[in-house]
Regions:
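Outer-membrane beta-barrel and related beta-rich outer-membrane complex signature
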Residues: 30, 93-97, 141, 175-185, ...
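A short, flexible beta-alpha/helix-coil linker loop
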Residues: 53, 90, 134-136, 241-243
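Extracytoplasmic gating/loop element in the C-terminal half of outer-membrane beta-barrel translocons
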Residues: 162-237, 245
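C-terminal beta-signal and terminal closure region of outer-membrane beta-barrel proteins
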Residues: 248-258
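Transmembrane beta-barrel strand/turn architecture of Gram-negative outer membrane proteins
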Residues: 50, 127-135, 142-175
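Gram-negative/organellar outer-membrane beta-barrel architecture
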Residues: 1-128, 155, 163, 192-196, ...
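One-face residue pattern on beta-strands with alternating periodicity enriched for small/polar residues
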Residues: 70, 105-109, 128-130, 148-150, ...
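Short glycine-centered, acidic/aromatic-flanked micro-motifs in structured strand/loop junctions
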Residues: 20, 131-133, 240
Length: 258
């Protein structure tokens, strides 16, 4: 991965960041242009973001082009609020379904991150909540509502005992799930989801056995870390959760390790 940033584009304080990341399953090119508001440039600003991503992972093949305009408020309380408008054009094959979908959808987001202790925080927490809404009335190819919530808590007791908990929720409401791009569908599995399972390998499947993606997601993790000496830590964890489209067909998966 490589990135380049120009912190001062002009006398108004605009800045530009570009990044490129390349791996076997994903190749991505992004840019972000920040426009501070003169009345409060440190806490209020616009972001214009765009990019292209190619994905070939498990049963997903996708080419995605995106453009977004967002308005941010960084509050003194530590909370960040944003409203955004996104456009995307996706050509994808997910399992046995191939489609091209154009989306134009607004959304809102609120988040906060706090930490103490440097690169290995001894205390901290992170919350992020978002809602996105698409409707064919203004040109999108599919109607949907998407709600997501991510939470992380870190606490340390008596210097040596560190506890990390994580929780993720997601819900998609739509009448045409096959037209929802894979990037918006839910998959579980991997280091930040359910360890012990391949990355994004948990979801409902098509009749041929290919992954379909889910409209509902819930995962949770509890990890205990012990400071053996200096910078050496030992850890044990339990992860559990599911990615399903019918909550009546629960299929919880659990991973544990040390």
């Amino acid at each position: 991965k490589a990135s380049w940033r120009k912190p001062w584009v002009n006398s108004y304080g605009h800045s530009l960041t570009t990044s490129v990341s390349v791996s076997a399953p994903e190749q991505q090119l992004d840019f972000s242009y920040k426009i501070p508001l003169l009345k409060n440039p440190l806490e209020q600003y616009y972001l214009v973001q765009g990019g292209f991503k190619r994905t070939d992972l498990n049963d997903t093949e996708q080419d995605s082009t995106t453009l977004a305009v967002s308005r941010y408020w960084d509050l003194s309380s530590g909370w960040q609020r944003a409203i955004n408008l996104r456009w995307s054009l996706d050509h994808f094959t997910q399992g046995e379904v191939t489609d091209t979908t154009m989306l134009l959808y607004p959304g809102v987001m609120i988040s906060r991150t706090r930490s103490r202790g440097g690169l290995m925080p001894t205390w901290g927490d992170s919350q992020r909540y978002s809602i996105d809404y698409s409707n064919t009335a203004w040109g999108s190819d599919v109607d949907f509502s998407v709600f997501q919530a991510q939470n992380v808590w870190i606490r340390t007791l008596y210097d040596r005992h560190r506890f990390v908990t994580r929780g993720n929720l997601g819900w998609i409401e739509t009448g045409d799930f096959d037209k929802v791009p894979p990037d918006l569908r839910f998959f579980a599995g991997g280091d930040r989801s359910i360890r012990g399972y391949k990355y994004k390998s948990i979801s409902p499947k098509y009749s041929n056995g290919d992954l379909k993606g889910a409209s509902k997601l819930v995962t949770g993790s509890l990890e205990y870390q012990y400071n053996v000496t200096g910078k050496w830590w030992g850890a044990m964890f339990v992860d559990s959760g599911e990615a399903v489209s019918d909550i009546r067909k629960s299929d919880f998966k659990t991973g544990a390790g040390v």
